Amino acid sequence: WFGISGISNLINTLYLQFKSWTPPRTDPLVLDLDNDGIETIGIGGTVVVFDHNADGIRTGTGWVKSDDGFLVLDRNDNGTIDSGRELFGVDTMKSNGALATNGFEALSELDSNGDQVFDQNDAEFAHVQVWRDFNQNGISTANELFSLSELGIVSFNLNATTQNVNLG
C-alpha cells in the first residue's frame, strides 16, 4: 500500500499526475503588429506589473514586447488602460455581469450588428484601440494607444479557433 519512500500509492499517483500540470493560459487578445509572431517577456528579468483582475493590486506578469499590442477599450473613458477589464480576455466583464471565457467572447459583445465580424459597421469599432507598451511598465500613456484605423486594421473575424503555440 506504500509506494516510493513510504508514500501511499494514491499520493504517489496523484503526485505523478500533477507534477507536470500547468494551468491553462487565459491570455487577453494580442496583435502581432510586425508579422514576426507574438513576442513576450517573462517575469524573470524586467518585471511588469499590471492589475489584470481589477482588484486594485498590480501584480507581476508576463507581457508582450512593444512591437506587438493588446487590443483594448478604455471603458471608463479616463484615457488610460487601468486593468484587465479594459483588455479583451477572461477579466473582461460582459454586459450581463459575468466574466468572458476568452478574448473573442469579450470582443463579440461589441458586435452590434451580429454578423460575427467586428468592423466599422459596429458601434464601438472607432473606440477600440491597440496598446503598445513602449516602456514596458504596464501603465498606458496617450502615445502608446493607437486607433485600429491608424494601424490599418479593418476587421476581426469573431469565429475563434484554438491553436496551441509555445511562445517561449
Name each region found by the language model.
Residues 3-168:
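Calcium-binding acidic motifs and repeat modules
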